[in-house]
């Protein structure tokens, strides 16, 4: 039987709509399980908050009751970020300003590009400075660092050593390449060591190409890189290892990344942070794993992160792409991201979460097909941006008001970060000051009113 083309189109549309609805419902069935949500909520409450007690006394030390205290959170200790790869590189000043606004409105953390191929495309000609020749997605680090300082953004360098995106001129013999890397490490540490205190030292070693000059079955270039870089950077610098999505999230019993990191730490390798990528560069790839693949079920994700947490090092989700392409893609993207961020935020040792490309059409190569930005290409926020804004600036930001008790104390529990405290007595502001509230501790502050 032949069907008119119009009926075939309608049928295709119905099937596509059904598939989208099925994904949304299936995702919720997996992630909205009450026991899982309760565990996530408990983790956030236990690991992301602290307690503060404000004690108000007069000049003689006598406690003052009925004093109004307002606590307003100003910053987060937890690092929420994205890469900063196209800062100032968009088509118009308006788009560049919208990019900055979309970034600073929700983020306090930025990944800066140190890919060797673009930092030193010609041997000896380093692209550190503002005047360096333009390369798309590779603004000079000096420019990015200056912007981070102005906007109180914590910078992170990525990466120092990777088997990919290297200049054509690098040596093909192992010892000569090690010497070239040593020089690279020294130059970067000398210029940025005091200002950039988090670095991905080794990237994606477990998928290293066998054609890479430093490759060996033992991957001994990994401890070598950490041992070379550790003396070059201040002790306060966090030196990280970073690994790809499907490798780093395997169940514990078969997780080669866990085995690698444990072995390196046991041998004394100075790894100080552990990074997990979370890239899905197409809708088909995302649907291959979500919501039913066991590796990316919420219970396995929590088990993997909790097992890595036993190593007592900070954990970071370092690179995230969740696609927004396809019918209903923007809604599905926001739905998935809300659940994933909540899970990540609940893990005790988790210290930061980095989205990858802030805007659509700014990704590397064909990775842009995923439409994995938080905004569209015109920098208009997508539902996923609003979902993160709600989490970071509303759900996970504390503001409270109350009065001191008969002992002159006002207590509150809030998300870790800095707070502005306003003290009002008899409708007159007496003091305003800032406090720092750490995670899982109690801050005791005494305020004296004349």
Regions found by a protein language model. Name each.
Residues 6-16:
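Bacterial N-terminal signal peptides
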Residues 20-65, 70-88, 121-125, 156, ...:
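Beta-strand-rich domain onsets/edges
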Residues 29-30, 191, 200-218, 225-228, ...:
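Aromatic-rich peripheral "rim/lid" segments of glycoside hydrolase catalytic domains that contact
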Residues 86-95, 117-122, 127-128, 132-139, ...:
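Acidic-and-aromatic substrate-binding clefts and catalytic sites of carbohydrate-active enzymes
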Residues 90-101, 139-143, 183-188, 216-229, ...:
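Alpha-helical scaffolding within the catalytic cores
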Residues 92-105, 411-418:
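Short Pro-Gly-centered beta-turn/loop motif in secreted/extracellular proteins
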Residues 105-117, 185, 192-207, 237-245, ...:
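Aromatic- and acid-rich polysaccharide-binding/catalytic face
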Residues 109-125, 138-246:
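Substrate-binding cleft and catalytic face of glycoside hydrolase catalytic domains
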